[in-house]
A protein has these predicted regions:
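Short, Lys/Arg-rich, polar N-terminal cytosolic tail immediately upstream
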Residues: 1-18
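Internal alpha-helical transmembrane segments of multi-pass membrane proteins
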Residues: 20, 72, 79-100
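Membrane-water interface at the C-terminal end of transmembrane alpha helices
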Residues: 23-31, 126-142
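Alpha-helical transmembrane segments
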Residues: 25-35, 97-101
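Alpha-helical transmembrane segments of multi-pass integral membrane proteins
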Residues: 26-27, 66-70
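Transmembrane alpha-helical segments of multi-pass membrane transport proteins and ion-pumping complexes
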Residues: 31-43, 71-79, 108, 128-133
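Membrane interfacial helix motifs at helix-loop boundaries and amphipathic/re-entrant anchors
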Residues: 37-67, 105-122
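Hydrophobic alpha-helical segments of small multi-pass membrane proteins
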Residues: 93-104, 120-131
């Protein structure tokens, strides 16, 4: 009886994708928790998160949801880089830093108070500080 053995490159790639997904999901949960805690602390310190452009106040759970969604987008980008790039870790860092920088434009243009804008900028950087190194580490792991 013979067993089909997958090519080692395919097995290695599948193993690395599973590892990336696992690390990414754990990092997503950590980023969601960290962002929610920082948002709650900012709210407790008096930041109202009122955005005049939309006429709404951002609810604390909204930070967790948006962080989760965009963290999963980051995992998908990292997976694509793992599959199609010869240097996925380096490409991930460049891509993620560029996307983080672009994401800072919205808080700066939202028309909120200085405290709200500062808190929103910080709340963009918190999940980036969790996700970028975690996925970089996972992409570098052999």
């Amino acid at each position: 009886m013979t067993a089909a053995v997958p090519a080692s490159g395919r097995t290695s790639r599948a193993h690395r994708l599973r590892g990336l997904a696992g690390v990414g999901l754990l990092a997503t949960l950590a980023a969601m928790l960290a962002t929610t805690v920082v948002a709650a602390l900012a709210r407790a310190a008096g930041v109202d998160f009122a955005v005049p452009a939309g006429g709404e106040t951002i609810p604390i759970p909204g930070f967790a949801v948006v962080t989760g969604v965009f963290s999963v987008v980051g995992i998908v980008i990292a997976a694509a880089l793992l599959l199609w790039s010869t240097r996925p870790a380096a490409r991930w860092v460049w891509t993620a830093v560029a996307l983080t920088a672009i994401s800072l434009v919205a808080p700066l243009l939202c028309g909120g108070t200085a405290a709200t804008v500062t808190a929103l900028v910080g709340l963009h950087l918190v999940p980036a500080a969790v996700m970028i190194p975690a996925l970089r580490w996972s992409l570098r792991a052999e």
